[in-house]
């Protein structure tokens, strides 16, 4: 099962993420948990989130890039849900062997995220990649949809179909 942890503080303003979710919903075996809908007060139901993660084979963290990072509710979700003794540490093996895909949308072009001489997403993904590895997750190459503020509908739709294709290819490779 593919579990999409969707974290957009203003989902009604997002044309790109909306299209990505619409494409993902057309696949079998996809569950979407919209954190800002579920937890507008930031009071996360840790047991419910861990139960959802337990059912997943592929976990997707989907969100808009905010100041070169993740939205605050996703950060809190990571801090609370990926707990010691469950996701890492002594006895914390609940996520071992599962896969993680970072799916991010940006308003700027890819070159906007270069940091000095370093390709931006290689640097920006390091904290998330380190978290994944620490929890025994298999890190997949990120999916990034750039220039979402200026893309026309056709371009956004094409990129959303590419996202669906990435998910479908993962499903086919892991479940035939």
From Swiss-Prot:
HAMAP family to which the protein is assigned, alphabetical: K_H_efflux_KefF
Provenance organism: Shigella boydii serotype 18 (strain CDC 3083-94 / BS512)
UniProt GO cellular component terms: plasma membrane
InterPro entries per record: Flavodoxin_fold, Flavoprotein-like_sf, K_H_efflux_KefF, KefG/KefF
Homology family: Belongs to the NAD(P)H dehydrogenase (quinone) family. KefF subfamily.
Catalytic activities: a quinone + NADH + H(+) = a quinol + NAD(+); a quinone + NADPH + H(+) = a quinol + NADP(+)
Sequence positions that bind FMN: 8, 14-17, 65-68, 105-108
Subunit structure: Homodimer. Interacts with KefC.
Domain of life: Bacteria
A Gene Ontology molecular function term of the record: NADPH dehydrogenase (quinone) activity
Keyword tags: Cell inner membrane, Cell membrane, Flavoprotein, FMN, Membrane, NAD, Oxidoreductase
Enzyme nomenclature, EC number: 1.6.5.2
Primary site of residence: membrane
Pfam family, one: Flavodoxin_2
Any one biological process term the GO annotation gives: positive regulation of potassium ion transmembrane transport
Protein name: Glutathione-regulated potassium-efflux system ancillary protein KefF
Record membrane topology: Peripheral membrane protein
Gene from which the chain derives: kefF
Function noted in UniProt: Regulatory subunit of a potassium efflux system that confers protection against electrophiles. Required for full activity of KefC. Shows redox enzymatic activity, but this enzymatic activity is not required for activation of KefC.
Cofactor: FMN
Compartment annotation: Cell inner membrane
């Amino acid at each position: 099962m593919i579990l999409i942890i969707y974290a957009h503080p203003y989902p009604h303003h997002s044309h790109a993420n909306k299209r990505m979710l619409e494409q993902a919903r057309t696949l079998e075996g996809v569950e979407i948990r919209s954190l800002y809908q579920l937890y507008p007060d930031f009071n996360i139901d840790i047991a419910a989130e861990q139960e959802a993660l337990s059912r997943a084979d592929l976990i997707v963290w989907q969100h808009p890039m905010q100041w070169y990072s993740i939205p605050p509710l996703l950060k809190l979700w990571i801090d609370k849900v990926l707990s010691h003794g469950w996701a890492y540490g002594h006895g914390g093996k609940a996520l071992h062997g599962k896969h993680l895909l970072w799916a991010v949308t940006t308003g700027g072009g890819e070159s906007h995220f270069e940091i000095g001489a370093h390709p931006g997403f290689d640097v920006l993904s390091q904290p998330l990649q380190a978290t994944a590895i620490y929890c025994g997750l298999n890190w997949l190459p990120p999916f990034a949809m750039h220039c979402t503020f200026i893309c026309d509908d056709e371009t956004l739709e094409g990129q959303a179909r590419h996202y669906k294709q990435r998910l479908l290819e993962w499903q086919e490779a892991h479940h035939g």
